[in-house]
């Protein structure tokens, strides 16, 4: 794993992936942090299970989608995105397909995108 350096703006230098563009400054807004975590928990309640892990780095992660339980190591189905992307999906401002096409959502595993069946969470 590459080592990351935190820059003056709070962003991790050399980081890759959807969350790396966001930086740690997002924690300066407690409303954003609360919204992201609340909506992640809401996702886990609406589609309970352990088959897919939805990650919003620096904010939280939940396991959801019924199916085979995952107990150790990296789950076979993982989705990762920034806080802004997660909020846009949860609020119905964009689709999973849009976020994937624009590289703001990373997904691995054959069932990774099954979490999208309950989106948007807020109607």
Regions found by a protein language model. Give the residues of each.
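Feature captures hydrophobic
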Residues: 1-123
């Amino acid at each position: 794993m590459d080592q990351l350096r935190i820059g003056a703006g709070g962003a991790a230098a050399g980081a890759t992936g959807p969350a790396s563009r966001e930086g740690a400054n997002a924690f300066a807004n407690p409303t954003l942090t609360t919204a992201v975590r609340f909506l992640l928990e809401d996702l886990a309640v609406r589609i309970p299970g352990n088959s897919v892990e939805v990650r919003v780095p620096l904010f939280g992660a939940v396991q959801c989608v019924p199916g085979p339980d995952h107990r150790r190591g990296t789950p076979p189905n993982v989705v990762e995105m920034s806080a802004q992307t997660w909020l846009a999906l949860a609020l119905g401002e964009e689709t999973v397909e849009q976020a994937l096409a624009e590289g703001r959502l990373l997904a691995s595993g054959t069932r990774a995108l099954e979490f999208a069946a309950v989106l948007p969470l807020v109607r």
